[in-house]
């Protein structure tokens, strides 16, 4: 498994770099602020690390389970949803909001504005940079990366759908 870094160069990311790069993505999409912890994992993960006969890192498997799905649609006043939603509202990745059809106001998105939208101990802008770089280190193509972001913004926009009943 080989990846290029976020910068346009011929330098290859090592397998170790790729394994480490999974963390910002797992945290962005799996961690949220709860009443007790600003960066609480809302899913389980099992990481199996493989070594070759010489004791060198040869690969890893990550299995996720039990994602707290209800957190997407509702949060308590002192909590917030998954970090990625708040990261995507930051300017770190220049045209992200435009490409994902997001406004500049987090309060336009009911699913993610019911609780805290800012947390003093979390820098959403910096964390978005880490997440974006991690996608690149993990060999996501530009199209794949933007599809992930667009899917995430679609979830944010789903909270704005209104049901209308028609009587015939």
Residues of each region from the PLM?
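N-terminal switch/interaction subdomains of large nucleotide-dependent motors and GTPases
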Residues: 1-168
